[in-house]
């Protein structure tokens, strides 16, 4: 009998590590495991890895428990990314030339070397522009080195707020966008956008909506409480016990679900 591949969402937060493993069973996703791993204070500060050895130690024993057939989608802090929209050049470019043009244009706008950037982009044909998400190469390299040292099968590195977009089709009207929060920040997502705001910028969901210029009546919070969106409801087959602080796994769940 073939063993299903574990699809793992891994969200490294400032106060701990949250992970979940799903398998695809015919037309639905099934929960295999979830983990909450402690993280030494000061290891992650404002989304940046300050103590890589502490992070490696925190993940080492966990990594050895994973089956050989696994693939990991790893969260990257939205606060360490930059989103830009670049008007397309008048001349149609081939794929390689287009990639180089985006790299050079982005580097010029940021006043950085193209070699210091990692980026992904999509072509918005309606607006005749490229939507670009960029991060510092050193930040991405640190995660790639971590995964390599732990023999993790890394599938993707995705901005944490972007992972919340996986839940948008599951919202019940009039809800059209959602937010997640921890002690220091808000992450938010709509069908076409995502981002991060510091908690001092908004104390409540209504204040966040006002700051973003989004309709508060169409908002919901990733939360198991009545009126919120429970991210665990996106998994078709669950198995007890589930964590009491379930909202902390929202990003990890979105990553593990992917496009399934």
Which ranges hold each PLM region?
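Hydrophobic/aromatic-enriched cytosolic interaction surfaces used to assemble or bind macromolecules
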Residues: 1-260
């Amino acid at each position: 009998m073939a063993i299903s591949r574990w699809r793992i969402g891994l969200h490294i937060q400032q106060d701990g590590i949250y992970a979940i493993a799903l398998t695809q069973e015919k037309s639905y996703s099934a929960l295999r495991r979830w983990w909450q791993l402690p993280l030494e204070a000061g290891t992650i500060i404002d989304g940046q890895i300050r103590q890589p050895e502490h992070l490696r130690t925190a993940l080492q024993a966990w990594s050895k428990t994973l089956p050989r057939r696994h693939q990991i989608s790893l969260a990257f802090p939205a606060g360490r990314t930059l989103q830009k929209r670049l008007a397309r050049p008048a001349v149609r470019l081939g794929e390689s030339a287009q990639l180089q043009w985006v790299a050079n244009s982005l580097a010029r706008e940021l006043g950085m070397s193209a070699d210091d950037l990692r980026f992904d982009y999509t072509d918005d044909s309606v607006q005749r522009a490229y939507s670009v998400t960029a991060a510092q190469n050193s930040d991405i390299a640190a995660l790639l080195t971590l995964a390599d040292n732990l023999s993790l099968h890394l599938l993707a590195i995705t901005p944490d707020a972007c992972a919340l977009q996986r839940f948008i089709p599951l919202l019940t009207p009039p809800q059209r966008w959602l937010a997640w929060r921890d002690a220091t920040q808000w992450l938010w997502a709509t069908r076409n956008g995502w981002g991060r705001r510091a908690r001092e910028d908004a104390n409540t969901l209504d204040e966040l909506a006002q700051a973003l210029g989004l309709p508060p009546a169409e908002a919901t919070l990733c939360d198991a409480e009545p009126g919120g969106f429970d991210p665990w409801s996106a998994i078709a087959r669950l198995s007890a016990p589930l964590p009491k602080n379930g909202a902390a796994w929202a990003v990890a769940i979105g990553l593990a679900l992917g496009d399934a």
